[in-house]
Amino acid sequence: MKKQRIVVKIGSSSLADSHEGISKEQLSDHVAALARLKEEGHEVLLITSGAVAAGFSALGYPSRPVTIKGKQAAAAVGQSLLMQAYTEEFRKYGIVTAQLLLTRSDFSRKEQYSNAYATLGELLNRSALPIINENDSISLEELTFGDNDMLSALVSGLVSADMLMIFTDVNGLYDKNPQKNEDAKKYYFLPEVTEEIASLAGDAGSKLGTGGMKSKVDAAKTALSLGVSVFIGTGRGQEKFVDVLKGKGDGTYVGNAPQKEMKMNKQWIALHSVVSGQIEIDAGAATAIIQHGKSLLPAGVTNVSGFFQVGEVVEVMTQQGRVIGKGQCTYSAEELRDVKGMQSQHIQARGERHSYEVIHRDHWVSL
């Protein structure tokens, strides 16, 4: 089997008992299967939930807390317990683990995003197995972030994974709730995530997690847009992850032919960057960018909104108000207002710049 880079996401519902916290039996089962993937020569990253589930009983809560402060306190205790449990299990297979705790800001800030990329790459080069969780003891986002489902999709794109496996307590996607409807139809394969499929996914998750099928479907859609195929399902035993790669997984495969892989810088622009302003362009410039893959030049700019600096991300819109994309601007707002509508040779005559693109095509993402 060809060596692949695999991201496996394991949710709280696949790790924990509703009253006793983390199940050692379930965790051991997952680790044995992850070790088999490594044994087959694949690179593996683990996105794990379970910090809150691991910590609530140690703090005396009878069940998973419902308040933000309770969840964050449980996560602060549980993260170390969870990591200790993983480390001890992986040590049995001679696998070195590494812990990374991420927040949304680690993705929105370009330098931190690049650092995460470099760190994960080095860990994989050294044959370590990164274990990633949201830093939910300080992050509000995790509480509504879908039990790390979207985090797993974003990490999959960041490391250019071949596949994202989202493991849960339900064996795939159905057209209705299989626990309440005996005639529920299972989807074994979906070429894409359509609006119809998205609408079928419910909002509610299990008592242990914050997820649910909606967050998993949303994550699958994002992963596909970044060039990563997805599996959503369940399984037991040492071969369960290897079986997924062989097409024998107990769940739903999504996107046999995902979109073209998106480079790291464009991922950051598309999904994580903060928009600092807007640029309005004429029809000719829009055609050149969208249909012919050209860079945006000052001549095509008709209006500038906001106060942005060089290198910040701006939205680009047509004169009819339709946003067509965004990118990193090589001019400040003040500079661009001064040269908008001007031909490059006229700017060159000023002798002020060596480059005239407003947004280079390598730093542009169509929406």
From Swiss-Prot:
Keyword Glycosyltransferase among record annotations: no
SMART domains found in the cross-reference section: PUA (SM00359)
Binding site for ATP: 9, 168-169, 210-216
Pathway, per record: Amino-acid biosynthesis; L-proline biosynthesis; L-glutamate 5-semialdehyde from L-glutamate: step 1/2
The reaction(s) this protein catalyses: L-glutamate + ATP = L-glutamyl 5-phosphate + ADP
GO molecular-function terms, A-Z: ATP binding; glutamate 5-kinase activity; RNA binding
Keyword Metal-binding: no
Any single Pfam family the record assigns to this protein: AA_kinase
HAMAP family on file: ProB
Family assignment from sequence similarity: Belongs to the glutamate 5-kinase family.
Protein name: Glutamate 5-kinase
Species: Bacillus cereus (strain ZK / E33L)
Lineage summary: Bacteria, Bacillati, Bacillota, Bacilli, Bacillales
